[in-house]
């Protein structure tokens, strides 16, 4: 009897444990089963459970993928702004190249200023500009000098207007000397230049003759106008050279030489009048 009671107790305990262990399993199974159903409502307004259609689900996923794919590709092609890498520039005060450039500009500016000051002293007296012109001073030389000062100055020169006015005045007076050259019967008006030569010192006369010989050697080589301009051959000395050679005493037989001089004067003037950067 006692043994029967013990067996009955063990049976009861084991059965209870099996029930407790089986309960979560059934609940989870029920949850899994219900999770595969989707809530829907019929035409009568009653809620029904319908199993998910696997093919419909895959179709929806494919449609979503196709809808998102263009946006993803567009995002992938979008270029993000690159981070700017700071680097030394020519304008940086710490760049040694900037200092070298500044020193070079200063030296060029000082040289141009020195030549301008020397020229002003040279052309300060009476008839001094005409005398300097006979010695080889040309508008192109002044133009280059003016442009150097403007280019190598760190700011607008304080005497910019004065330099421009003096340059324009010289150019205007210089080309007036050729007004008679373009008449039907060319006139050189070299009488006043001869007076200036006679008033020169012996050294000045020798220098002017040497300059005429140099111009003669260059012209006789048959260079083009562009080449003569690049060498800055003085048009006035060119004309004086032809006068010394007697070209204007017989215009009919020397028409080609006179026409060549005319063409050079025109080309030279056009070159001078063309504006340049910094000028």
From Swiss-Prot:
Residues 1-22 form the signal peptide. GO terms for cellular component: extracellular region; host cell nucleus. Disulfide bonds: none annotated. Secreted effector that completely suppresses the host cell death induced by cell death-inducing proteins. Keywords: Host nucleus, Secreted, Signal, Virulence. Belongs to the RxLR effector family. It is found in: Secreted; Host nucleus. Its main location: secreted. This is Secreted RxLR effector protein 152.
């Amino acid at each position: 009897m006692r043994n029967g009671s013990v067996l009955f107790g063990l049976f009861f305990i084991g059965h209870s444990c099996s029930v407790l262990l089986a309960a979560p399993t059934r609940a989870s199974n029920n949850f899994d089963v219900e999770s595969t159903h989707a809530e829907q409502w019929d035409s009568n307004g009653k809620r029904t459970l319908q199993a998910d259609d696997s093919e419909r689900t895959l179709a929806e996923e494919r449609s979503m993928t196709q809808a998102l794919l263009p946006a993803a590709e567009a995002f992938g092609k979008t270029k993000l702004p690159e981070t700017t890498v700071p680097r030394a520039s020519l304008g940086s005060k710490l760049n040694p190249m900037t200092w070298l450039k500044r020193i070079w500009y200063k030296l060029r500016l000082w040289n141009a200023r020195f030549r301008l000051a020397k020229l002003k002293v040279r052309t300060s007296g009476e008839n001094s500009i005409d005398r300097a012109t006979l010695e080889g001073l040309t508008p192109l030389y002044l133009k280059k000098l003016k442009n150097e000062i403007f280019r190598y100055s760190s700011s607008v020169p304080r005497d910019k207007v004065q330099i421009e006015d003096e340059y324009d005045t010289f150019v205007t007076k210089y080309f007036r000397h050729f007004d008679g050259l373009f008449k039907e019967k060319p006139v050189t008006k070299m009488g006043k230049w001869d007076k200036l030569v006679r008033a020169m010192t012996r050294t000045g006369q020798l220098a002017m003759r040497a300059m005429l010989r140099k111009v003669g050697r260059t012209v006789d080589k048959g260079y083009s106008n562009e080449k003569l301009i690049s060498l800055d051959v003085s048009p006035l000395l060119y004309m004086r050279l032809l006068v010394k050679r007697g070209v204007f005493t017989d215009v009919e037989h020397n028409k080609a030489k006179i026409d060549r001089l005319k063409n050079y004067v025109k080309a030279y003037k056009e070159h001078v009048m063309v504006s340049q950067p910094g000028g």
